[in-house]
């Protein structure tokens, strides 16, 4: 079986289809399933703000990536997705070196997926909550 024949859930869990950007930011897939995606980010020093907390842009990238994994796990082979809208509410900040995001698809249509996500510190403190709309591009 080639990598393209393996279901998206398995490919994502194995890191097969993850861009270099994903690894550059210290991300790793913890869970890639039809019901939920979980991505962990070991925050590189360069992603800390001048005052110590993890930069909000790094949190946004983690949330966007985690939602992308959640949507990809629900897609038929060959379909692609792209972020249309991402609304993040930052609740708190984290100075911890690990941030974990979870995401799930709320509604999956033919061309659009509505999703939600949250990012937490490794200790479980809520950092941000997000809603997103992803476009679905089928072959």
Regions found by a protein language model. Name each.
Residues 1-139:
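Terminal targeting signals and extreme-terminal segments of soluble enzymes
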